[in-house]
């Protein structure tokens, strides 16, 4: 894990500030491009079905880190942009494991995604089902 953090020490203050400015520009462009047309963006929470618990724990530490990186790639971007998001259950995979969708809102508009998530759960029953253990 330390080996993955050490390269960050090589980033200069100038490069860090430039990257922060670039992130701010991408964030503005994303927000303007998406939220000028919709109130909420709906996307998968993770890009592939969840593994079994045994599969999730298998492999080396690097394997687990890579797996978590794959799973978080759709939520990580939204977090980087600082947007509010809520994941709600929307079904089960063919293996019987839960699948989620994320509701993504405008900056500081948590109320809208919470209302939408609540409304979704009132008309579906996915949040009441549990996978077999």
Put a short name on every predicted segment:
Residues 1-28, 44-48, 87-97:
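Short helix-loop capping/hinge segments that flank enzyme active sites or metal/cofactor-binding pockets
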Residues 18, 51-72:
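Short, surface-exposed loop/helix-turn segments at secondary-structure junctions
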Residues 26-37:
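Short amphipathic alpha-helices and their capping/turn segments at secondary-structure boundaries
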Residues 31, 63-88:
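Small-aliphatic-rich amphipathic alpha-helix that forms the alpha element of a beta-alpha
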Residues 39-41:
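Short, Asp-centered acidic motifs that coordinate Mg2+ and/or phosphate
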Residues 88, 97-106, 113-114:
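Short, well-ordered beta-strand elements
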Residues 113-133:
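Short, gly/Ser/Thr-rich active-site loops of penicillin-recognizing serine hydrolases
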């Amino acid at each position: 894990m330390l080996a993955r953090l050490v390269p960050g020490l090589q980033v200069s203050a100038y490069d860090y500030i430039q990257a922060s400015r670039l992130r701010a520009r991408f964030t503005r462009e994303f927000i303007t491009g998406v939220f000028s047309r919709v109130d909420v963006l709906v996307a998968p929470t993770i890009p592939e079905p969840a593994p079994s618990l045994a599969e999730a724990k298998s492999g080396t530490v690097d394997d687990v880190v890579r797996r978590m990186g794959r799973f978080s790639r759709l939520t990580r971007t939204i977090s980087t942009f600082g947007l509010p998001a809520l994941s709600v259950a929307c079904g089960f995979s063919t293996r019987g494991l839960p699948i989620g969708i994320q509701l993504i809102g405008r900056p500081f508009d948590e109320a809208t995604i919470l209302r939408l998530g609540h409304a979704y759960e009132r008309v579906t029953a996915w949040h009441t089902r549990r996978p077999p253990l």
